């Protein structure tokens, strides 16, 4: 799928070349060349919010979980674990105040249907000013794209996490250490089980580097476990194509976006919304 006059996304050159003729059927010569689908990114940074942080990312957008390597040549020429249109992302971000490790797998067409599957597992540690936080858990989700409205989809998901709050800077704070049965506090290990559902309207020309269209999402989640509370997030983004070369390259894009979230009064501090930083 691409813009008029441009190669379809995922191909270096237009793959279809029809031969002229007067027959009711057109003979098509298919000559497709796949572009680069995998990325390896390595970086590091330092800032006043998170200290020194490294970043290593392996991202493959044409993954195949069933295509195991049969020889060293499959690994050397890049054919192992590729070819099914799945996405796999492995990220490691070690640091002095923040460290995060995640693995994500996405199947956009589960069993050749319009149902998509996404799974992820993560480990996270962050040293805040007033306490330290550690998380380990995973998520699984299903999505469905409507036939009558391809831009519209719905999703449902579940997340399970164990959140450990430790090393409080000040003792006796009720929100951290609690002050009775009605407020157990969040110090120690907390169980988080979230059940969510959402709706998405997406007209972007590309999910990775969009230049036109919009994305509007709304997700509601009910969390149970150590604390019980609802959460909701609305996000909207609009992309405007300002200028481009005659061949479609060198695009200048203006992007506008906003996020609105709400959460119940019993939400613990580790799941609150905060302005600025992370």
PLM region spans:
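C-terminal outer-membrane beta-barrel translocator/porin domains of Gram-negative envelope proteins
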Residues: 19-27, 38-51, 57-59, 164, ...
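Aromatic side chains
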Residues: 63, 105, 122, 129-131, ...
């Amino acid at each position: 799928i691409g813009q008029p006059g441009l190669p379809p996304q995922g191909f270096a050159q237009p793959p279809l070349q029809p031969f002229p003729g007067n027959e009711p059927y057109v003979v098509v010569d298919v000559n497709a060349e796949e572009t680069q689908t995998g990325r390896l990114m390595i970086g590091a940074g330092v800032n006043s919010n998170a200290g020194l942080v490294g970043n290593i990312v392996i991202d493959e957008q044409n993954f195949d979980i069933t295509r195991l390597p049969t020889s060293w040549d499959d690994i050397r020429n890049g054919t192992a674990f590729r070819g099914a249109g799945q996405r796999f992302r492995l990220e490691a971000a070690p640091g002095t105040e923040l460290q995060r490790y995640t693995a994500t797998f996405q199947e956009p067409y589960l069993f050749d249907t319009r149902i998509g599957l996404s799974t992820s597992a993560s480990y996270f540690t962050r040293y805040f000013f007033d306490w330290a936080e550690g998380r380990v858990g995973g998520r699984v989700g299903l999505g469905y794209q409507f036939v009558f409205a391809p831009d519209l989809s719905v999703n449902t998901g579940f997340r399970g996490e164990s959140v450990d709050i430790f090393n409080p800077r000040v003792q006796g704070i009720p929100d951290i250490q609690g002050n009775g049965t009605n407020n157990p506090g969040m110090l120690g290990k907390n169980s988080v089980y979230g059940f969510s559902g959402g709706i998405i309207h997406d007209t972007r020309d590309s999910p990775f580097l969009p230049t036109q269209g919009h994305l509007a999402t709304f997700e509601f989640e009910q969390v149970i476990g150590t604390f019980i509370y609802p959460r909701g997030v609305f996000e909207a983004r609009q992309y405007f194509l300002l200028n481009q070369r005659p061949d479609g390259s060198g695009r200048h894009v203006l992007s506008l976006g906003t996020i609105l979230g709400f959460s119940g009064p019993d939400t613990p501090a580790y799941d609150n919304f905060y302005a600025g930083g992370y």
